[in-house]
């Protein structure tokens, strides 16, 4: 089993010529490769895409077999992927998914990091995160709008809708956390982001997600103060350990205006540098003594969260951004770790109630103009959504594409299928140079059960019920998505979440149009259903408005 190969540099093909037998198998192959593009993945030579050890394939042998199989797959066959390894090809039918993926799933009694690591070392499992193992990661853009929407809502709730002259304190500049600095600036706030790995700061600077780098707290704060004097928000990366810097900020009486965290705290071995440790020490100990790493990391997380609680008690609006750091701290004896809320119940759930979530699409042509044309079509189809228009304008101006050109755009039930059909028509007419791939994050309204994140504090107490993502995956399979995934442990770590994903190809054919209409209606419809079933009036009203058939509502 080979996981590290520094000789491998993966980039997807672009343009209209394909090496598979159809676009329905060319698309997952290109998206798998795009996940490992050096401008996209965090550690592509190790097959790691983002989120600690979130991988696209189990090992390089599995990667090669997946590509080989996709190239020969027939139009009525389905490839099965078990934790990043291709295990079977079966005859299905033309409207069935071409790929079905199950990643990181464990029977509940064994659903913990210790058992996962045992299997991982034996080559029997892979951590798929959310969009890493499901081949629809698009770089930090994939979470930018959701983060932006969260920060805007924080501004509405706490500062009258105006974040000018305000600053956000956070940590973590990995594949997900790397979106925070740009999202904050787009929302009108400055951002101080702590990151322990120089390579991550350098990547965010290179890709335009971060403006400046500072060597000390004082230098970072001076940069932010200067930006406020010029009425121009700035994002600053500070090299250091959050478990050391946050307590220092508390001791010095410094008060940010907003506070959150996106370190990879969900994975105490691979995702969080213990306080006082060097990177070299951390990397070595992860291999030689992972239990010691986990113990030290969790102790540091407790210190980190205590500092967040101190700032929260001092009146700083504070939110957990979904990395399970509160749970880790509580396990270490911080009994009031959940005194500050998660971002979904505090700021995002009303959107989920209407099936609104992280809809995304990718231009398989590799031509940015294809994305700009789809941006224009979105504005044309949704003429009254000025907030969305503003987002698209900012995205074009501020967001650099990583790998294949892509766009993230939060839309919901009733709009997703219209956009998908429009994109399909654009492919059919030749307005776009190649097909479009349409997908989403697993963080969506009906596709995840995660009691410390997306389903925290559900009205009816159904936080841990994971029937919903299973139903979502089954329905997307029956509806004809091109590939469907079912994962465990994404975002918050082993034992704390189950979630599903779907991707569908708009190749310009009438058959694709039928699949697009079904999938892109049904998928967000499950989100409205899930929240209506939990008793949310917004969701119940949306279900009635859209004519959903919900027998128990």
Swiss-Prot record:
One of its GO terms (molecular function) is urocanate hydratase activity. SUPFAM superfamilies: Urocanase. Gene3D superfamilies: Urocanase like domains (3.40.50.10730), Urocanase superfamily (3.40.1770.10). PROSITE patterns: UROCANASE. Binds 1 NAD(+) per subunit. It is found in: Cytoplasm. One of its GO terms (biological process) is L-histidine catabolic process to glutamate and formamide. InterPro entries: Urocanase, Urocanase-like, Urocanase_C, Urocanase_central_sf, Urocanase_CS, Urocanase_N, Urocanase_Rossmann-like, Urocanase_sf. Keywords: Cytoplasm, Histidine metabolism, Lyase, NAD. It comes from the Bacteria. It catalyses: 4-imidazolone-5-propanoate = trans-urocanate + H2O. Pathway: Amino-acid degradation; L-histidine degradation into L-glutamate; N-formimidoyl-L-glutamate from L-histidine: step 2/3. Belongs to the urocanase family. Catalyzes the conversion of urocanate to 4-imidazolone-5-propionate. This is Urocanate hydratase. It comes from Sphingopyxis alaskensis (strain DSM 13593 / LMG 18877 / RB2256) (Sphingomonas alaskensis). The gene is hutU.
